[in-house]
């Protein structure tokens, strides 16, 4: 009986499957939550300042140091864009560790999906934590169009990047903006990008 009790008390220590998508942290739709904060905080500013970071997988100590450092600069930075690769293998636990660290930021951030984040069912975990893989937002008169460009991880079986989404965003006239920044993890010409379509980005 004692042995059985010990086993039962240790059940929470068992990871049933590395690609179990059931999250144990409360964060959901991080981008959907933070984008309105970014837009509201910058609406009266003449100049916007943002930090681009990424590829933080397995670099938990360094990411913690980054968060501590960037929090000392919070009065001079409006928001952060994480360019993806929170994980090495797309595992739920990796996502949770990364998001737990990033949740300590005093500055709102948005997250793109990286090629490592797609592995297994990592894209599904990303969708739960951050929202859609393709999204946009406007800061002052600058539109940020954020794309999933990690074609190789889908074996080119999905339309990645989604040119339908990109076209709609670039033709959108419902809100005023004068400049556009297209943000992505895998750049045109990289091995993760579908280079059959890279000329579109020239």
Each predicted region: which residue ranges?
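Active-site environment of divalent metal-dependent phosphoester hydrolases
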Residues: 58-62, 88-94, 116-121, 152-155, ...
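N-terminal active-site segment of His-dependent metallophosphoesterases
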Residues: 11-97
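His/acidic metal-ligating clusters that form di-metal
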Residues: 71-79, 154-202
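Sec-dependent bacterial lipoprotein signal peptides
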Residues: 1-11
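Stable alpha-helical elements in mature extracytoplasmic
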Residues: 46, 59-66, 83, 94, ...
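Core catalytic region of metal-dependent phosphoesterases/phosphodiesterases
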Residues: 64-134, 138-139
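Active-site-proximal beta-strand/loop segments in catalytic clefts of secreted hydrolases
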Residues: 53-56, 83-85, 112-116, 147-150, ...
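Beta-strand-turn-beta hairpins that frame and shape the catalytic cleft
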Residues: 39-51, 136-146, 171, 175-179
């Amino acid at each position: 009986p004692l042995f059985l009790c010990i086993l039962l008390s240790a059940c929470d220590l068992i990871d049933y499957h590395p690609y179990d998508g059931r999250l144990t942290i409360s964060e959901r739709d991080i981008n959907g939550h933070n984008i309105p904060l970014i837009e509201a905080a910058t609406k009266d500013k003449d100049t916007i300042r943002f930090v681009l970071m990424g590829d933080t997988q397995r670099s938990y100590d360094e990411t913690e140091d980054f968060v501590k450092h960037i929090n000392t600069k919070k009065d001079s930075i409006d928001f952060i864009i994480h360019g993806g690769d929170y994980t090495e293998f797309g595992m739920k636990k990796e996502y949770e560790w990364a998001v737990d660290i990033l949740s300590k930021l005093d500055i709102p951030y948005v997250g793109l999906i990286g090629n490592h984040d797609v592995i297994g069912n990592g894209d599904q975990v990303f969708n739960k934590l951050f929202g859609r893989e393709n999204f946009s937002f406007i800061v002052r008169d600058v539109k940020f169009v954020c794309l999933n460009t990690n074609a190789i991880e889908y074996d080119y079986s999905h339309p990645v990047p989604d040119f339908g989404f990109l076209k709609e965003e670039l033709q959108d006239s419902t809100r005023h903006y004068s400049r556009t920044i297209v943000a992505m993890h895998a750049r045109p010409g990289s091995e993760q990008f579908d280079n059959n379509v890279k000329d579109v980005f020239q």
